[in-house]
Regions:
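Histidine/acidic-rich helix-loop-helix segments that form or flank divalent-metal centers
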Residues: 195, 235-276, 290-291, 302-348
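Helix N-cap / loop-to-helix initiation motif
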Residues: 38, 184, 241-242, 295
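Active-site-proximal alpha-helical segments within enzyme catalytic domains
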Residues: 224-228, 268-286, 293-302
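His-Asp-centered metal-binding catalytic motifs of divalent-metal-dependent phosphohydrolases/nucleases
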Residues: 188-215, 231, 246-260, 275-282, ...
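Short, solvent-exposed cationic patches
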Residues: 50-64, 290, 345-346, 354-366
Length: 416
C-alpha cells in the first residue's frame, strides 16, 4: 500500500463527507470514506496526527477536484466559489468494486483447489503455486479490508472448497500478523507458501468433512493426525526448496514451543507458530457441516491468548491484524442498531460499522456509516450471523471504506 501524506488543512468542512479513507503512517484505517467528521473532539484528534491516504485514492480525488473547479470556471463563478468547489464524495462507478473483489477471490480459490489436488514433481506445480501466491498477495495489498470482509463473511456461511478457501484466509491473517511483527520479506514469503500448502495431503478430505454432518471415522482421524508430516513430505518430493516453508508445514500443529520467546526460536519454528495461530482462528470462525461457525471474539480467545490467558507476542499481533470485530462480522451498537463491520479501526475494538437495522428493528434503505469511537455507536456485542435476516448490497456497504476508485477485477493468471 503506497501512502500519500495529507495536510490537516485539506480536510473537508464539517458538513462534508470524507472523499477517501484517512489512514495513519502504518496504513491502519482511522476514518472511512463517506463519514462526516462532525465530532469536534474527533476532528481535533485527527488534526494532531500525521494523516495519510492511499496514493491512488488521493490522485483520483485531485483529478475530480480539478474537474469540479474547471466546471465552476466555465460557468463564470467568482474566484472564491471556484476555490470552494468540491466533487461528490464518491463516484457512481464504485458499485462494481466489491463484486470484483469477491469474484477475484473465488477465481483464486478455484485455481488453488486445482493446484492442491495436483501436487507432484513432474509438472509445473511449483510455478503455478508461486504465481498464485503472487496474485493473492497483490490482491490483499490492494484491497485489504474488502478481502478480510470477504473471507469472514463467506467463512460463516459456506463450506464449498473449504480447503482452498481456508488456505487463502490463513495466508491473509498470517502475512498481516507477520508484517506487524516486523519480519523480513523472505520469512513472510515462506509463511505465505506454507499457509497455502499446509493441508495439501488432506485437501479432498477437508472438503468432504466440511460438507457432512457426521464426525470423522477412525481412519479419517488417523489421516488428519498425520497430515502435517505427510504434507511436508509431498512438498519436498515436489521440489519445493524453501526449507523454512517445508519445515513450518511439518511443525504447524506442534504446540510445544508455545510460551517461549519468539526471537529465541528458529525461523521455521517462528513461521510454524504464526501459521498455527492463524490456522486456528480461521478454522474456528468457519462453518462446517457438523457445527456452526464460532464468533470472531470467541475464536480470538483460542487463537490469540498465550498459556497465561493473556495475548502473547503472536496473539497481540494477530489481534491487531484482524481486530476483535473483523470486517464481515455483525455487531450490535450502543445505539441498539445492528450492523456489519466494514473495516478495521485504529484499535481492535473500534471498527468502522455500516448500520443496517435501527434500534426498533426497521431496516435502513441505505447502510449508515457509524464511527465506533463515538460512544453513542460503540460496539456493544458481536451478533451471530444467523440472527441477521436483512438483505443488503455489499458494494454499498464496502463503499463506506473503499474510497472513490473503482478498481478493475483481477485479470486471469498468467496474463501479466
Amino acid at each position: 500500500m503506497k501512502l500519500f501524506a495529507i495536510a490537516t488543512k485539506d480536510l473537508p468542512p464539517l458538513d462534508r463527507a470524507l472523499p477517501f479513507p484517512l489512514r495513519d503512517a502504518t496504513g491502519r484505517l482511522l476514518v472511512g470514506a463517506g463519514i462526516k467528521v462532525a465530532d469536534e473532539r474527533l476532528r481535533q484528534e485527527l488534526q494532531r496526527k500525521s494523516l495519510f491516504a492511499e496514493e491512488h485514492h488521493y490522485v483520483e480525488w485531485q483529478r475530480r477536484l480539478n474537474a469540479a473547479m474547471d466546471q465552476r470556471l466555465r460557468e463564470g463563478a467568482a474566484l472564491k466559489d471556484v476555490v470552494a468547489a468540491r466533487p461528490d464524495a464518491a463516484p457512481r462507478e464504485l458499485a462494481a468494486r466489491s463484486v470484483s473483489t469477491g469474484d477475484a477471490w473465488f477465481k483464486l480459490r478455484s485455481r488453488l483447489d486445482a493446484v492442491l489436488r495436483d501436487v507432484g514433481p513432474d509438472n509445473d506445480w511449483l510455478d503455478r503455486l508461486a504465481e498464485l501466491h503472487t496474485r493473492g498477495r497483490a490482491l490483499l495489498q490492494r484491497r485489504a479490508e474488502e478481502s478480510l470482509y470477504h473471507f469472514v463473511y463467506e467463512a460463516v456461511r459456506f463450506s464449498e472448497r473449504y480447503s482452498a478457501q481456508h488456505a487463502w484466509m490463513t495466508l491473509a491473517l498470517a502475512e498481516q500478523t507477520a508484517a506487524l511483527l516486523g519480519w523480513p520479506q523472505a520469512r513472510v514469503d515462506s509463511l505465505g507458501r506454507a499457509a497455502l500448502t499446509m493441508n495439501v495431503a488432506i485437501s479432498r478430505l477437508q472438503d468432504h468433512l466440511a460438507s457432512v454432518r457426521l464426525p470423522p471415522t477412525v481412519e479419517q482421524r488417523r489421516e488428519l493426525a498425520s497430515h502435517a508430516e505427510r504434507s511436508a513430505a509431498l512438498l519436498a518430493a515436489a521440489g519445493l526448496d524453501v526449507a523454512v516453508a517445508v519445515q513450518a508445514v511439518r511443525l504447524h500443529h506442534d504446540a510445544h514451543a508455545e510460551g517461549r520467546p519468539l526471537q529465541e526460536q528458529t525461523p521455521a519454528r517462528q513461521v510454524a507458530r504464526v501459521l498455527r495461530r492463524a490456522d486456528i482462528f480461521g478454522a474456528k470462525i468457519s462453518r462446517r457441516g457438523s457445527r456452526a461457525a464460532m464468533s470472531p471474539l470467541a475464536a480470538a480467545r483460542g487463537a490469540c491468548l498465550g498459556p497465561d490467558g493473556q495475548p502473547d507476542e503472536i496473539g497481540g499481533a494477530l489481534l491487531r491484524a484482524v481486530g476483535l470485530y473483523p470486517p464481515g462480522s455483525f455487531v450490535e451498537l450502543a445505539s441498539g442498531e445492528v450492523g456489519i463491520v466494514v473495516a478495521r479501526g485504529r484499535r481492535a475494538n473500534l471498527p468502522l460499522v455500516a448500520a443496517l437495522v435501527s434500534a426498533n428493528g426497521a431496516v435502513y434503505g441505505e447502510p449508515v456509516p457509524r464511527e465506533t469511537l463515538d460512544r453513542r455507536y460503540a460496539v456493544k456485542t458481536a451478533v451471530p450471523p444467523e440472527r441477521v435476516k436483512v438483505r443488503f448490497q455489499h458494494d454499498k456497504v464496502l463503499a463506506l471504506a473503499s474510497g472513490p476508485i473503482a478498481t478493475a477485477s483481477l485479470s486471469p493468471l498468467g496474463s501479466r
